[in-house]
UniProtKB/Swiss-Prot annotation:
Residues 1-13 form the signal peptide. GO terms for molecular function: interleukin-1 binding; interleukin-1 receptor activity; interleukin-1, type II, blocking receptor activity. The chain crosses the membrane at residues 356-381. Glycans are attached at N124, N208, N231, N289. This is Interleukin-1 receptor type 2. Residues 382-410 are cytoplasmic.
Amino acid sequence: MFILLVLVTGVSAFTTPTVVHTGKVSESPITSEKPTVHGDNCQFRGREFKSELRLEGEPVVLRCPLAPHSDISSSSHSFLTWSKLDSSQLIPRDEPRMWVKGNILWILPAVQQDSGTYICTFRNASHCEQMSVELKVFKNTEASLPHVSYLQISALSTTGLLVCPDLKEFISSNADGKIQWYKGAILLDKGNKEFLSAGDPTRLLISNTSMDDAGYYRCVMTFTYNGQEYNITRNIELRVKGTTTEPIPVIISPLETIPASLGSRLIVPCKVFLGTGTSSNTIVWWLANSTFISAAYPRGRVTEGLHHQYSENDENYVEVSLIFDPVTREDLHTDFKCVASNPRSSQSLHTTVKEVSSTFSWSIALAPLSLIILVVGAIWMRRRCKRRAGKTYGLTKLRTDNQDFPSSPN
């Protein structure tokens, strides 16, 4: 009995978890939030290829490139932190201008001293990964214009399209934000017949593009945070090129029907083939019931991914994904369309989201029962056949025993 008591006491001592107490007796203990990682080294995945070039005094968001691959939201034991390369302290420290929301680091407003390399670190109980993002903050002067501008190209004598980029987080957080377009210092108002609204405030159409339309454009969005308004400026350099031989874009995905489960996160890529060799000015976007995605879903439940252009075996492709987070029943009755357009041709492909059947299948559940019935039926038939054969043999024997044979001559 004494030996049994010693064994039980020893096992309980080894299995009791270590806890950190808050210091108040009335409060329950909480476990330490720092995950255990084998070794203290993180695997560095490299630097994000795109640097963030922003203006001083404006809001800035830095996205962690590891987030789409880490599935942070689905695990309560995963952690994502931010730090600056020249500092060992984690962000936000005591800096009221910086905070972390999900996988995004917010800086509001940005100052030139914020320029530098930022490290996002993803940890869980089994591994640790890091990637870096470069931020450069410039003064809002004419001299900084070439450094902070996005290059966009339009073909001569065609309908040009300007896109105000990198506003996803601000639009979803500020549904009432207004966007105004400027060419140089001139406001492009609704009365201007050459510049037309595309139905989406982040896009501007240029009717019959000419060489005079080349130059610098600005799109300015008003963003309100804690009752204070901030301007978010994106500068665009438009270059107009003469008509060239453009390839006809061929949309090779998605399928006409996309299976999905309600409540799940869904990514539908629109992949467009652009031919071989030469580069292309093809633009790809998504529509929902003939409405731009940002206008159809101002809260950001459905969004467009980045415009990704790449090559495979000397073949050029461009890809833009449609991201559902999450899928709802409304999506089952929505006509989604991927559009690929360049000066030579415009192509589109419709697709719909279809709810997949439940993971529980009656055919699978009834399969064992059907097998049992089949086996029992086979056994019953076998026994029945044996009984019939036995009865036939008995009757034959009985008739043979009772048959009268003619007597022998003797």
